[in-house]
Amino acid sequence: MMDKNAKIYVAGHRGMVGSAIVRELQRQGYNNIITRTHKELDLCRQENVEKFFAEEKPEYVFLAAAKVGGIVANQEALADFMWFNMTLEMNVIHSAWQNGCKKLEFLGSSCIYPRMAPQPMKESCLLTSELEKTNEAYALAKISGLKYCEFLNRQYGTDYISVMPTNLYGPNDNYHPTHSHVVPALIRRSHEAKVNGVESVTCWGDGSPLREFLYVDDLANLCVFLMNHYSGNETVNAGTGKELTIKELTELVAKVVGYTGKIEWDASKPNGTPRKLLDVSKATNLGWTYKTELEEGLRLSYEDFLNNPMRAER
């Protein structure tokens, strides 16, 4: 268990996941949280990361920093996604180990699992078959971080754990028109279509892929829970165990936003993985479950979007 006064470093505190973890830690009474902006500490510069850890000596680390993006971004910047994420992860994890960090939690992504993995996907299906090509570079980087944590545990007896969230959404998301994930992209497009009186919007694919979505504050709650209650080499899936089609999601976002125009589909564009549902029985058996249903989470996300218009420019 983390002491309330323990020094806790949250890497990536300005992102959606990192900021949610900071909120959750504060909500639970942890009062010695340290953070650094990218300007203050470039996590891709090994010397700077080593210096930071040597000086600050954080007892616990939540590694939520990452370069993320949707299908378009992942296809256009394969090398960038792989280099940035692998470099960042190795620098932070290695420096944490070198400086006696008591426990580290690595945040991954469900895209690490094979494209055609049996559904729902168990933690044990990792590396059993081919990855989804549209985000292969990012997935390989995340697998490397996960495995490095496991290997440190096995070789040096560290207590480094990993969490693999399903598709996330919520406050402080990235609403960039081409470099965002599906929920923020749909929120922005539906909102702009409503405001501008656009009669129809066109979405990629045919709307058939099945997806699962977890509100980011629920993930943050699980992250703190696992830091206090879980140790092990195998990752832990984070999700709701519920799924819906992209078409159903698009219609639900339109409902929440208040867009009443027509939704069309461009089947010449890629769908991505046909189905992605996590088996969350491991987290459930540990005593955790999500709280926020999708429609309520989308409503909260849209409120956040409206209250923070500059996020659409990121």
Sequence positions of predicted segments:
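Conserved Rossmann-fold NAD(P)-dependent oxidoreductase catalytic core, especially the SDR/UDP-sugar
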Residues: 4, 90-135
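C-terminal substrate-binding subdomain of Rossmann-fold SDR/epimerase-dehydratase oxidoreductases
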Residues: 11-16, 20-28, 192-314
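Adenosine-cofactor binding site in Rossmann-like domains, unifying the SAM/SAH pocket
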Residues: 26-51
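NAD(P)H-binding glycine-rich loop region in Rossmannoid oxidoreductase-like domains
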Residues: 46-86, 98
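Short-chain dehydrogenase/reductase
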Residues: 82, 86, 134-146, 176-184, ...
